[in-house]
């Protein structure tokens, strides 16, 4: 990790916190406000998703019941751990929820893991191709974390309608938690409860990864003789953080869907 000598400390931090942007209104590499697509987030997340699918596909094709290899052992442990977690939290049909939970955990972990890559490495590679700004940690971008949390929110709504029906869900919204006589308050409470879920889910992941990335950038600004020691200490701690955050995102997704799928 090293800082660019031509930039001040503030400029260096700002440079690494800026995205490679595409204006969807006129398709130029400028900031288009709401109509802005962060290309770096899109590229890294898609590449990591494709890598995840490719690795699992290759290991599944080469799987053997006799003497499994290291990759097969690791994937089987991950699958069994996630399936056991889902089984404890979700008591309905797990044919969709278990694969979804596994996908979320592995994909979010891989995106979080990009925070451990030296802060100047990937931006420098893209800079050689003429890209001025490139932010390599997708989960440090709120647009991605909110996109994922909104997708979870849509699944929660789907399971609410699937398990309770429109009439059953309507009765639940109007009558709980204070009974039929306080229907307006019940509706307000329900809207707040459902609205907070995707917001907290997105901000928790974004906040932790954004802070972690910022600390790595600040370490890169320190003298070379202190970068290695502090970088190693923070890397070891942050390895725990990125794993826990991936697990929390997966776990809350399963819990929210489980609550929606419960019929009363």
From Swiss-Prot:
The regions listed as transmembrane in this protein's record are: 39-59, 97-117, 139-159, 205-225, 239-259
Instruction: Write out the entry's keywords from A to Z.
Output: ATP synthesis, Cell inner membrane, Cell membrane, CF(0), Hydrogen ion transport, Ion transport, Membrane, Transmembrane, Transmembrane helix, Transport
Q: Which GO terms describe its molecular function?
A: proton-transporting ATP synthase activity, rotational mechanism
Listed Gene3D superfamilies: ATP synthase, F0 complex, subunit A
InterPro entries with a match to the protein in the record: ATP_syn_F0_a_bact/chloroplast (IPR045082), ATP_synth_F0_asu (IPR000568), ATP_synth_F0_asu_AS (IPR023011), F0_ATP_A_sf (IPR035908)
Annotated GO biological process: proton motive force-driven plasma membrane ATP synthesis
Q: Which Pfam families match?
A: ATP-synt_A
The record's subcellular location field reads: Cell inner membrane
State whether keyword Repeat applies. no
Give the principal location in a single coarse category.
membrane
Q: A GO CC term?
A: plasma membrane
Q: Topology relative to the membrane, per the entry?
A: Multi-pass membrane protein
Report quaternary structure and partners.
F-type ATPases have 2 components, CF(1) - the catalytic core - and CF(0) - the membrane proton channel. CF(1) has five subunits: alpha(3), beta(3), gamma(1), delta(1), epsilon(1). CF(0) has three main subunits: a(1), b(2) and c(9-12). The alpha and beta chains form an alternating ring which encloses part of the gamma chain. CF(1) is attached to CF(0) by a central stalk formed by the gamma and epsilon chains, while a peripheral stalk is formed by the delta and b chains.
The UniProt function text for this chain reads: Key component of the proton channel; it plays a direct role in the translocation of protons across the membrane.
Q: Which family does it belong to?
A: Belongs to the ATPase A chain family.
Q: Which NCBIfam families match?
A: ATP_synt_6_or_A (TIGR01131), PRK05815.1-1 (NF004477)
This protein's name: ATP synthase subunit a
According to its UniProt entry, this protein's organism is Coxiella burnetii (strain RSA 331 / Henzerling II)
What taxonomic lineage is listed for the species of origin? Answer: Bacteria, Pseudomonadati, Pseudomonadota, Gammaproteobacteria, Legionellales
């Amino acid at each position: 990790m090293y800082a660019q000598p031509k930039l001040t400390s503030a400029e260096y931090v700002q440079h690494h916190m800026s995205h490679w942007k595409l204006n969807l209104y006129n398709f130029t590499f400028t900031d288009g406000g709401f109509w802005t697509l962060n290309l770096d987030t899109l590229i890294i997340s898609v590449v990591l998703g494709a890598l995840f699918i490719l690795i699992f596909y290759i290991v599944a094709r080469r799987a053997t019941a006799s003497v499994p290899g290291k990759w097969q052992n690791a994937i089987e442990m991950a699958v069994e751990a996630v399936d056991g977690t889902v089984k404890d939290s979700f008591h309905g049909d797990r044919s969709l929820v278990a694969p979804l939970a596994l996908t979320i955990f592995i994909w979010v972990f891989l995106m979080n893991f990009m925070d451990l890559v030296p802060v100047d490495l990937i931006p420098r590679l893209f800079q050689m191709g003429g890209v001025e700004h490139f932010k390599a940690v997708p989960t440090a971008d709120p647009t991605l974390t909110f996109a994922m949390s909104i997708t979870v929110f849509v699944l929660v709504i789907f399971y609410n309608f699937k398990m309770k029906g429109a009439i059953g869900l309507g009765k639940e919204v109007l009558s709980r938690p204070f009974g039929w006589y306080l229907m307006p308050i019940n509706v307000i409470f329900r809207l707040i409860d459902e609205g907070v879920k995707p917001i907290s889910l997105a901000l928790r992941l974004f906040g932790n990864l954004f802070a972690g990335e910022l600390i790595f950038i600040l370490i890169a600004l320190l003298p070379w003789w202190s970068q290695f020691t502090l970088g190693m200490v923070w890397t070891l701690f942050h390895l725990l953080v990125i794993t826990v955050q991936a697990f929390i995102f997966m776990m809350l997704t399963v819990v929210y869907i489980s609550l929606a799928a419960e019929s009363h």
